[in-house]
Structures are given as structure tokens and as C-alpha cells.
């Protein structure tokens, strides 16, 4: 595994992608932003992924649940952390994700990522 963990960041808002990339890269992770569009999403080719941040409320024609299933199929060992303004993990996501962080709490986000990545490395 690489010494620098890579975090796949999935959101439909390019501003949020930029912000979360800055946050994860501020502590040495490598941010890999993927924007969800009406055409779907394109995962990076040949890039290792150690963890995934996934926005729960996507405005395009795909749900976070469907995206999480795609992520698990492509990166089965990468833990998924849901980012949301809701208060708890939705039932349909509970068995798929390993973390949940409310938006606006970068300290908790980084703590969660560090813990999950440390378990893998």
C-alpha cells in the first residue's frame, strides 16, 4: 500500500468537492474528487483508494445507496464514510458504510478517516 492514503471524495457539488479535498489534503491524505453528474460518475483509473467520502444527498439521478454499491464493487476493502446534514445513518446504508459524519465538522471527519485508514494500513 502507498504511504499516503488516498481518499475518494464523491459529491454532486463541485464546490463541496473542492472543500473536502482541501480538508483531507491538509493532513496528508491524497484527495481524489469524483463529481456525480447526470451521466453518472467516473472512477479514477488505476488509482488506489483507501477510503471513500460520500455525500448522502445527491441531486442527480442516482442515490447515495446506488453509488455506495458501485464503490463497494470496485473498492471492496475501502471503508465508506457518509457526509450528510441528517442526524443518523439511514437504514438502507447501515450495512454498507463504516462511518457517518455530519457536514460542518472537519475535525470529526478527519478523526474518522484517520481511524479507518489506520485499520487498513
Locate predicted features:
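Two-component signal transduction core modules
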Residues: 52, 80, 100-101
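Two-component/phosphorelay signaling modules centered on CheY-like receiver
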Residues: 14-32
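Acidic, metal-coordinating helix/loop segments flanking the phosphotransfer/catalytic sites
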Residues: 32-51
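Non-catalytic signal-transmission and effector/linker regions of two-component phosphorelay proteins
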Residues: 1-8, 106-121
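Hydrophobic/aromatic residues positioned on beta-strands within the core alpha/beta folds
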Residues: 83-84
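Conserved phosphotransfer cores of two-component systems
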Residues: 45-47, 70-77
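Conserved phosphotransfer microenvironments
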Residues: 54-69
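As written
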Residues: 92-101, 105
